[in-house]
A protein has these predicted regions:
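Boundary-proximal intrinsically disordered activation/regulatory segments immediately upstream
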Residues: 1-65, 147-149
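Active-site/ligand-binding-proximal alpha/beta "capping" segment
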Residues: 189-239
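Glycine/small-residue-rich loop that forms an oxyanion/phosphate-binding "nest" at active or ligand-binding sites
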Residues: 67-97
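Structured adenosyl-cofactor binding patch, chiefly the S-adenosyl-L-methionine
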Residues: 96, 133-137, 147-150, 155-163, ...
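Short acidic-hydrophobic, aromatic-tinged amphipathic segments that line or gate anion-handling sites
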Residues: 3-7, 73-78, 167-176
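Short, aromatic/basic amphipathic alpha-helical patches
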Residues: 60-71, 222-223
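RNA substrate-binding interface of SAM-dependent RNA methyltransferases
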Residues: 44, 101-103, 107-195
Length: 260
C-alpha cells in the first residue's frame, strides 16, 4: 500500500525546501532527485534514498514496485501538488529525497586517474555535463571549489546519473585545491582560452588534473600560477573560444586518450 499525502503534509513542505533552498539542503544533508530514470539510477548506485513521491496519475508506474522492493517509503500526492514540489515544471512523474554522499578531497588527491577541478563554476547546466563527461572519460573524481552547489537539482539532472557514481568533493579555496593536488604528485593543468599547449601534449607520466574556471571570467591569476602548466583546446575558423562544458569535455577526452 502506498500512502497518499495532502499538499500540506510536512513531507511535501520538506521536499519543496530541498528543491529550492541550498542552505536547507546542506543543513539536512539531503537533496532531491527528479524523474523516474534518475530515481532508479540512484537506487541502483546504492545511494541512501529516503523517500519517493509520485503524482497520483503515476500510481501504476513501474517505479513504485522498484521502490517498494528496495524497502524505500513511497507516497502519492495529487498531481497539482506534485507540480509544486519539483524545482521546475516537468512531466517527470517522480521525486526522491537522497542523502548527501560527499567524497573527501584528500582521498581524491591520492587517486591515480585524471581528476577534474571545477573552480567557481556558477551554472549547474555546465557543471552537470562536466560531471557526466568526467565519468564517461574515466576520471576518478571531481573537486568542486565554490560556485554551484553539487546537489543543485539542475546539476543533478544535467549529470544524468553520473553524480551518483562519480566521487565529488568540495573545497573552499581554488589555490588550496591546486596545492593539495600538486603536493600529492598530481600535475595540474589550467584550461585557458589562448596560450596553452593542446591537451593531447600533456605528459602522461603521472596523475593529472584538469582545472576549469567559471564561465565569464575563467581562472584567477593565482590559480593559474599555482598550476603545472596551461592547456588550450585548439579551434579553427572564426571560433575563438568554447563553452566551459564543451572545452572541458574535449580536454578530458584527450587526457583520457593520453593516459590509456
Amino acid at each position: 500500500m502506498v500512502e497518499e499525502l495532502s499538499g500540506g503534509n510536512p513531507r511535501c513542505r520538506r521536499l519543496r525546501r530541498l528543491a529550492r533552498d541550498r542552505g536547507f539542503r546542506h543543513g539536512e544533508a539531503a537533496y532531491i532527485v527528479e524523474g523516474p530514470t534518475l530515481v532508479a539510477e540512484a537506487l541502483d548506485a546504492d545511494r541512501d534514498v529516503r523517500q519517493v513521491v509520485l503524482p497520483t496519475s503515476a500510481a501504476g508506474h513501474d517505479l513504485v514496485r522498484l521502490v517498494q522492493r528496495a524497502g524505500v517509503d513511497a507516497f502519492l500526492v495529487p498531481d497539482r501538488v506534485f507540480d509544486g514540489l519539483a524545482s521546475t515544471r516537468s512531466s517527470q512523474p517522480a521525486l526522491a529525497e537522497v542523502a548527501f554522499h560527499d567524497a573527501e578531497a584528500a582521498a581524491l588527491a591520492s587517486t591515480s586517474g585524471p581528476l577534474v577541478v571545477l573552480a567557481e563554476l556558477g551554472d549547474p547546466g555546465n557543471a552537470g555535463p562536466l560531471v557526466r563527461s568526467a565519468e564517461a572519460f574515466g576520471a576518478t573524481g571531481v573537486l568542486m571549489v565554490g560556485g554551484v552547489d553539487p546537489y543543485n537539482p539542475k546539476l543533478v539532472r544535467a549529470a544524468a546519473g553520473s553524480s551518483f557514481r562519480m566521487p565529488i568533493a568540495t573545497i573552499d579555496d581554488p589555490v588550496a585545491a591546486v596545492r593539495l593536488l600538486t603536493d600529492t604528485g598530481v600535475s595540474c593543468w589550467a584550461a585557458v582560452p589562448h596560450g596553452g599547449i593542446p591537451p593531447t601534449e600533456v605528459p602522461s607520466d603521472g596523475p593529472v588534473a584538469l582545472i576549469l574556471g567559471n564561465e565569464p571570467h575563467g581562472l584567477d591569476a593565482g590559480v593559474v600560477e599555482a598550476c603545472t602548466g596551461l592547456i588550450t583546446v585548439p579551434t579553427v575558423g572564426g571560433v575563438d573560444s568554447l563553452n566551459v562544458a564543451v572545452a572541458g569535455s574535449v580536454a578530458l577526452h584527450a587526457l583520457a586518450a593520453g593516459s590509456g
